[in-house]
Protein backbone atom coordinates (compact mmCIF):
# COMPACT_ATOMS: atom_id res chain seq x y z
CA UNK A 1 0.00 0.00 0.00
CA UNK A 2 1.37 3.41 -1.01
CA UNK A 3 0.62 6.30 1.35
CA UNK A 4 0.75 10.04 0.66
CA UNK A 5 0.85 12.43 3.63
CA UNK A 6 -0.29 15.92 2.65
CA UNK A 7 0.92 18.39 5.28
CA UNK A 8 -0.49 21.88 5.71
CA UNK A 9 0.90 24.35 8.23
CA UNK A 10 1.54 28.10 7.83
CA UNK A 11 4.96 27.86 9.48
CA UNK A 12 6.09 24.28 9.89
CA UNK A 13 9.59 25.21 11.07
CA UNK A 14 8.18 26.82 14.23
CA UNK A 15 5.90 23.92 15.10
CA UNK A 16 7.43 21.45 17.56
CA UNK A 17 4.73 18.87 16.86
CA UNK A 18 5.13 19.05 13.09
CA UNK A 19 8.92 18.89 13.35
CA UNK A 20 8.61 15.81 15.54
CA UNK A 21 6.34 14.11 13.01
CA UNK A 22 8.59 15.04 10.10
CA UNK A 23 11.58 13.56 11.94
CA UNK A 24 9.51 10.46 12.75
CA UNK A 25 8.61 9.91 9.11
CA UNK A 26 9.36 6.31 8.10
CA UNK A 27 12.17 5.59 5.67
CA UNK A 28 10.09 3.73 3.11
CA UNK A 29 9.50 3.96 -0.62
CA UNK A 30 5.84 3.27 0.07
CA UNK A 31 5.30 6.49 2.05
CA UNK A 32 5.71 10.05 0.74
CA UNK A 33 5.42 13.51 2.29
CA UNK A 34 3.94 16.52 0.45
CA UNK A 35 4.12 19.90 2.22
CA UNK A 36 1.64 22.28 0.58
CA UNK A 37 2.95 25.62 1.86
CA UNK A 38 6.48 24.64 0.87
CA UNK A 39 5.38 23.54 -2.61
CA UNK A 40 3.14 26.56 -3.22
CA UNK A 41 4.55 29.53 -1.28
CA UNK A 42 2.59 31.92 -3.50
CA UNK A 43 -0.65 30.03 -2.87
CA UNK A 44 -1.16 29.10 -6.53
CA UNK A 45 -1.89 25.37 -6.67
CA UNK A 46 -1.03 23.30 -9.74
CA UNK A 47 -4.30 21.38 -9.89
CA UNK A 48 -3.32 18.89 -12.60
CA UNK A 49 -0.05 18.09 -10.84
CA UNK A 50 -1.91 17.45 -7.57
CA UNK A 51 -4.49 15.26 -9.28
CA UNK A 52 -1.77 13.20 -10.96
CA UNK A 53 -0.06 12.79 -7.60
CA UNK A 54 -3.23 11.50 -5.95
CA UNK A 55 -3.63 8.80 -8.58
CA UNK A 56 -0.29 7.26 -7.58
CA UNK A 57 -1.32 6.43 -4.00
CA UNK A 58 -3.74 4.09 -2.24
CA UNK A 59 -4.04 6.05 1.00
CA UNK A 60 -4.07 9.84 1.37
CA UNK A 61 -3.59 11.33 4.85
CA UNK A 62 -4.03 15.01 5.63
CA UNK A 63 -1.82 16.24 8.47
CA UNK A 64 -2.58 19.67 9.94
CA UNK A 65 -3.22 21.69 13.11
CA UNK A 66 -6.92 21.49 13.94
CA UNK A 67 -7.63 25.07 14.93
CA UNK A 68 -11.06 26.65 14.75
CA UNK A 69 -12.32 23.15 13.97
CA UNK A 70 -10.88 23.29 10.49
CA UNK A 71 -7.69 23.24 8.43
CA UNK A 72 -5.19 25.95 7.44
CA UNK A 73 -6.42 28.07 4.49
CA UNK A 74 -4.16 26.52 1.85
CA UNK A 75 -5.50 23.03 2.56
CA UNK A 76 -9.08 24.33 2.30
CA UNK A 77 -8.11 25.88 -1.05
CA UNK A 78 -6.59 22.54 -2.06
CA UNK A 79 -9.87 20.74 -1.40
CA UNK A 80 -11.82 23.39 -3.32
CA UNK A 81 -9.58 23.31 -6.39
CA UNK A 82 -8.13 19.81 -6.65
CA UNK A 83 -11.23 17.74 -5.88
CA UNK A 84 -13.11 19.15 -8.84
CA UNK A 85 -16.02 17.72 -10.78
CA UNK A 86 -15.17 15.13 -13.45
CA UNK A 87 -12.06 14.21 -11.46
CA UNK A 88 -13.23 13.44 -7.94
CA UNK A 89 -17.00 13.26 -8.50
CA UNK A 90 -19.67 13.69 -11.15
CA UNK A 91 -19.55 12.29 -14.67
CA UNK A 92 -16.43 10.11 -14.98
CA UNK A 93 -15.28 11.64 -11.71
CA UNK A 94 -14.26 8.41 -10.02
CA UNK A 95 -10.48 8.84 -10.07
CA UNK A 96 -10.19 8.46 -6.27
CA UNK A 97 -12.79 5.74 -5.85
CA UNK A 98 -11.76 3.03 -3.40
CA UNK A 99 -8.72 4.85 -2.04
CA UNK A 100 -8.38 5.65 1.68
CA UNK A 101 -8.88 9.11 3.19
CA UNK A 102 -7.50 9.92 6.65
CA UNK A 103 -6.74 12.80 9.00
CA UNK A 104 -3.78 13.38 11.31
CA UNK A 105 -4.90 16.15 13.65
CA UNK A 106 -2.67 18.16 15.97
CA UNK A 107 -4.89 19.61 18.70
CA UNK A 108 -3.96 22.11 21.40
CA UNK A 109 -6.80 21.32 23.82
CA UNK A 110 -6.97 18.22 26.03
CA UNK A 111 -8.81 15.15 24.76
CA UNK A 112 -11.35 15.20 27.60
CA UNK A 113 -12.66 18.58 26.39
CA UNK A 114 -13.96 17.05 23.15
CA UNK A 115 -17.10 15.50 24.55
CA UNK A 116 -20.48 16.50 25.88
CA UNK A 117 -19.86 18.58 28.99
CA UNK A 118 -16.29 19.36 27.97
CA UNK A 119 -14.96 22.78 27.09
CA UNK A 120 -15.46 22.21 23.35
CA UNK A 121 -18.79 20.42 23.74
CA UNK A 122 -18.46 18.21 20.67
CA UNK A 123 -16.52 15.07 19.85
CA UNK A 124 -13.78 14.92 17.21
CA UNK A 125 -16.06 12.63 15.21
CA UNK A 126 -18.75 15.31 15.18
CA UNK A 127 -16.34 18.13 14.30
CA UNK A 128 -14.82 16.21 11.41
CA UNK A 129 -18.17 15.50 9.71
CA UNK A 130 -17.28 17.80 6.75
CA UNK A 131 -14.23 15.62 6.00
CA UNK A 132 -16.29 12.47 6.35
CA UNK A 133 -18.77 13.97 3.87
CA UNK A 134 -15.96 14.79 1.42
CA UNK A 135 -14.69 11.21 1.57
CA UNK A 136 -18.19 9.88 0.96
CA UNK A 137 -18.78 12.29 -1.93
CA UNK A 138 -15.62 11.22 -3.76
CA UNK A 139 -16.09 7.53 -2.84
CA UNK A 140 -13.00 7.18 -0.68
CA UNK A 141 -12.90 5.04 2.48
CA UNK A 142 -12.77 7.31 5.53
CA UNK A 143 -10.35 6.19 8.25
CA UNK A 144 -10.56 6.95 11.94
CA UNK A 145 -8.40 10.07 12.58
CA UNK A 146 -5.06 9.91 14.32
CA UNK A 147 -5.44 12.59 16.99
CA UNK A 148 -2.50 14.19 18.80
CA UNK A 149 -3.55 16.20 21.85
CA UNK A 150 -1.35 18.80 23.59
CA UNK A 151 1.97 17.68 22.12
CA UNK A 152 4.09 20.21 24.11
CA UNK A 153 2.97 18.57 27.37
CA UNK A 154 3.80 15.01 26.33
CA UNK A 155 6.46 13.13 28.27
CA UNK A 156 9.38 11.51 26.47
CA UNK A 157 7.69 8.12 26.86
CA UNK A 158 4.46 9.49 25.39
CA UNK A 159 6.38 10.88 22.43
CA UNK A 160 8.02 7.54 21.80
CA UNK A 161 4.57 5.93 21.79
CA UNK A 162 3.39 8.63 19.38
CA UNK A 163 6.33 7.90 17.07
CA UNK A 164 5.23 4.26 16.91
CA UNK A 165 1.55 5.14 16.40
CA UNK A 166 2.44 7.61 13.67
CA UNK A 167 4.58 5.18 11.72
CA UNK A 168 1.93 2.49 12.08
CA UNK A 169 -0.73 4.86 10.76
CA UNK A 170 1.36 5.52 7.68
CA UNK A 171 2.50 1.98 6.97
CA UNK A 172 -0.04 -0.57 8.23
CA UNK A 173 -2.95 -1.55 6.02
CA UNK A 174 -5.32 -1.70 9.02
CA UNK A 175 -3.79 0.55 11.71
CA UNK A 176 -6.71 -0.06 14.09
CA UNK A 177 -6.05 -3.82 14.11
CA UNK A 178 -4.22 -5.12 17.19
CA UNK A 179 -2.91 -8.04 15.17
CA UNK A 180 -1.56 -5.72 12.46
CA UNK A 181 0.15 -3.44 14.99
CA UNK A 182 1.70 -6.43 16.73
CA UNK A 183 3.01 -7.80 13.43
CA UNK A 184 4.43 -4.38 12.55
CA UNK A 185 6.35 -4.16 15.83
CA UNK A 186 7.84 -7.61 15.36
CA UNK A 187 8.80 -6.73 11.79
CA UNK A 188 10.46 -3.51 12.95
CA UNK A 189 12.57 -5.46 15.40
CA UNK A 190 13.51 -8.04 12.80
CA UNK A 191 14.38 -5.66 9.97
CA UNK A 192 14.32 -1.91 10.48
CA UNK A 193 15.28 -1.19 14.07
CA UNK A 194 18.71 -2.82 13.89
CA UNK A 195 19.65 -0.52 11.02
CA UNK A 196 17.86 2.77 11.67
CA UNK A 197 16.98 3.08 15.36
CA UNK A 198 19.28 3.78 18.27
CA UNK A 199 19.46 1.49 21.29
CA UNK A 200 16.91 3.45 23.31
CA UNK A 201 14.34 3.42 20.50
CA UNK A 202 14.89 -0.27 19.77
CA UNK A 203 14.51 -1.17 23.45
CA UNK A 204 11.33 0.88 23.68
CA UNK A 205 9.81 -0.82 20.63
CA UNK A 206 10.74 -4.23 22.07
CA UNK A 207 9.08 -3.32 25.36
CA UNK A 208 5.96 -2.07 23.58
CA UNK A 209 5.80 -5.17 21.38
CA UNK A 210 6.15 -7.49 24.38
CA UNK A 211 3.44 -5.64 26.31
CA UNK A 212 1.09 -5.66 23.32
CA UNK A 213 1.60 -9.38 22.69
CA UNK A 214 0.94 -10.16 26.36
CA UNK A 215 -2.16 -7.92 26.38
CA UNK A 216 -3.48 -9.67 23.28
CA UNK A 217 -2.90 -13.09 24.84
CA UNK A 218 -4.75 -12.07 28.00
CA UNK A 219 -7.67 -10.73 25.93
CA UNK A 220 -7.82 -13.96 23.91
CA UNK A 221 -7.70 -16.09 27.08
CA UNK A 222 -10.52 -14.05 28.63
CA UNK A 223 -12.57 -14.36 25.45
CA UNK A 224 -12.08 -18.14 25.38
CA UNK A 225 -13.14 -18.40 29.05
CA UNK A 226 -16.23 -16.31 28.32
CA UNK A 227 -17.17 -18.54 25.38
CA UNK A 228 -16.53 -21.72 27.40
CA UNK A 229 -18.71 -20.46 30.27
CA UNK A 230 -21.55 -19.64 27.90
CA UNK A 231 -21.33 -23.11 26.35
CA UNK A 232 -21.73 -24.83 29.74
Can you name each region flagged by the protein language model?
Residues 13-14, 69-71, 111-113, 152-154:
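Short catalytic/ligand-binding loop motif for oxyanion handling, primarily in non-cytosolic enzymes
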Residues 58, 62-63, 116-125, 156-171:
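Short, electropositive alpha-helical surface patch
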Residues 77-86, 125-128, 160-163:
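Charged helix-capping and loop-helix junction motifs
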Amino acid sequence: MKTLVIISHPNINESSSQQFLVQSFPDSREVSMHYLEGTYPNGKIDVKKEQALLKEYDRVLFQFPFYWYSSPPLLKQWFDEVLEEHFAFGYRGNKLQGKEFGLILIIGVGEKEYQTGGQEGFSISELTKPYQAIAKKIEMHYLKPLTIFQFPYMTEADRMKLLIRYQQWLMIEKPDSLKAREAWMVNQLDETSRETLDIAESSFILEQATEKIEDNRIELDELRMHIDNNDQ
